[in-house]
Amino acid sequence: MYRALYAFRSAEPNALAFAAGETFLVLERSSAHWWLAARARSGETGYVPPAYLRRLQGLEQDVLQAIDRAIEAVHNTAMRDGGKYSLEQRGVLQKLIHHRKETLSRRGPSASSVAVMTSSTSDHHLDAAAARQPNGVCRAGFERQHSLPSSEHLGADGGLYQIPLPSSQIPPQPRRAAPTTPPPPVKRRDREALMASGSGGHNTMPSGGNSVSSGSSVSSTSLDTLYTSSSPSEPGSSCSPTPPPVPRRGTHTTVSQVQPPPSKASAPEPPAEEEVATGTTSASDDLEALGTLSLGTTEEKAAAEAAVPRTIGAELMELVRRNTGLSHELCRVAIGIIVGHIQASVPASSPVMEQVLLSLVEGKDLSMALPSGQVCHDQQRLEVIFADLARRKDDAQQRSWALYEDEGVIRCYLEELLHILTDADPEVCKKMCKRNEFESVLALVAYYQMEHRASLRLLLLKCFGAMCSLDAAIISTLVSSVLPVELARDMQTDTQDHQKLCYSALILAMVFSMGEAVPYAHYEHLGTPFAQFLLNIVEDGLPLDTTEQLPDLCVNLLLALNLHLPAADQNVIMAALSKHANVKIFSEKLLLLLNRGDDPVRIFKHEPQPPHSVLKFLQDVFGSPATAAIFYHTDMMALIDITVRHIADLSPGDKLRMEYLSLMHAIVRTTPYLQHRHRLPDLQAILRRILNEEETSPQCQMDRMIVREMCKEFLVLGEAPS
């Protein structure tokens, strides 16, 4: 911990302005003239001139509290940015956490009596963000790439270490194998010369020269730079009565984010002694001022844990969602931002606010996390909607034309149901859908079957799609219900309603996306005639389909249907394909999907994941010479190019490589490949490389078995490439 001896204000873009007496936690000695520090009061980070600071000794507990405050400040800044952590913020958190561990280790056995910060909100959000951000950097990967300094390499400031900065932000400095002790500062040499001559100066103004770390060079690729301990500033021989002008490059000050040092120029010297005499305080005042900035003692945190109910997070979520209509995730973000801001603005409330944030993170199921006797509002509304729709389904008068004026009421119910299924807590929705063996879901399916109004049918289809995204068990229920049969019949009988036709194809693809077995009775409506109907739409289109969206949806539906047909001799899709005279457009769309490596049927992340629909379809196509002939010669050459490229690019142990090998084996077996031998040398080299692999994983063993079978059946494949 360091305390500011003098007030400082600068127009530098990354410099922190501070008053005399403020305390700082030094995070990095970026250069000889600028140190990266965190303000103990608020956790704000920026660059400060070391000549203005004096180190405070024996304040480990206050250091820990300042570190906790800085961690929360970074977390609050990320929450204000939507809960996403930048690379710089991740680096600061890594540094602060490591600094905290080093401080605790230096405290010795006495540290065991102190409540160590458990899995904090900052750590939780950091790990969650690293898992879902495309550009996130996980902690393990960070530590592998940037080794942290060990405790024996640290000086008196043993918790200090560097954050790797982008090379474009680091000022050019000399690189060397190891830091060496720098020569004494100019002012110190002058003072020593004067003392040697017997005319030592009486000016006791502090100089920032000797407080500079000897290892001031910065490396962008390593955290192992070693620092020597800094000694307190020594009196110099002379000092300018006023600080020199500060280099100016801008007026904006960036907080809570790692930035390059303000400039390579020297930092301003502290003001003259007569200008700051009134601003200096005693050491006891330093301790008292620092004590007022503490986050609270261990006893206060323990009391906060007892005072804050474990259900407070769920109660806040329920209140915000009911009164604002925000989605479940947006409610969580909003509460996190508000509580984090209160925690930063009112330090006395920090222990309580931390417990609120923890309860917000730990609450998985909103309906279970609420206090006993309190029911989630979304759960209540789902009960009402499901019950009323079931009553209307069972009402015999509902089917009378005279009661069609209830369409507005049913529409409101279905729109509210869709809104809840989309925005509410998924755990609440899953629990309500699974109640009484999916009674509510099956009631909606029966209602869809008897409802003939297109607008209501469209809303029901949207609700079915939202249910499919909740859980794989709901998809299994819909597969076994009458819904697939009703959708297939509706698609073939009513081709005039383009929007309903598109939604029907989409929902059918969702229902069949998991590759589960279909009841045998369904194939009466999902057999070869239905497959031919879909192929006709792909090849010829419909007059009302001006957007050309329907052919792509029908391709996806054919791929999803084929997942349910393991036996090639009973594959109704392949039977329809062999009877179709021309499938040029369909084959081109298959090639496009194969080239991209996309699986349009894999819509959800439910487990277990089905096979790759495009690869399975092509394997079935080339399982018989009758269907293998659907591709034109040029398309066939392109298909071989794509397959060979994927086999070469995929790494050993990848499950997809086995699928591509099986596809290539089927192509060689059912097409005249040995006549044209397209890409044969490349294929031979790839197969020999796979045979020579030393990996022993089950996937690699399966790959080698397929290659041996190919070379045994077609000897030319096992020959050395010419």
Swiss-Prot record:
Subunit structure: Associates with the intermediate filaments, vimentin and desmin. Binds the first and third SH3 domains of NCK. Binds the proline-rich domains of N-WASP through its SH3 domain. Similarly, binds diaphanous protein homolog 1 (DRF1). Binds the SH3 domains of GRB2 through its proline-rich domains. Interacts with Helicobacter pylori toxin vacA. Isoform 4 interacts with FHOD1. Interacts with FASLG. Interacts with TMIGD2.
GO CC field: cytosol; glutamatergic synapse; intermediate filament; nucleoplasm; plasma membrane; postsynapse
Pfam families on file: SH3_1, SPIN90_LRD
InterPro entries reported in the protein's UniProt record: SH3-like_dom_sf, SH3_domain, SPIN90/Ldb17, SPIN90/Ldb17_LRD, SPIN90_SH3
Disulfide bridge positions per record: none
Principal location class: nucleus
Post-translational modification Phosphoserine, affected residues: 120, 294
Protein name per UniProt: NCK-interacting protein with SH3 domain
Gene source species: Homo sapiens
Biased composition (Low complexity): 110-121, 206-240
GO MF terms held by the record: Arp2/3 complex binding; cytoskeletal protein binding; SH3 domain binding
Tissue: Highest expression in heart, brain, skeletal muscle, kidney and liver. Lower levels in placenta, lung, small intestine and leukocytes. Weak expression in colon, thymus and spleen.
Job description of the protein: Has an important role in stress fiber formation induced by active diaphanous protein homolog 1 (DRF1). Induces microspike formation, in vivo. In vitro, stimulates N-WASP-induced ARP2/3 complex activation in the absence of CDC42. May play an important role in the maintenance of sarcomeres and/or in the assembly of myofibrils into sarcomeres. Implicated in regulation of actin polymerization and cell adhesion. Plays a role in angiogenesis.
Keyword Lipid metabolism: no
Modified residues (Phosphothreonine): 181
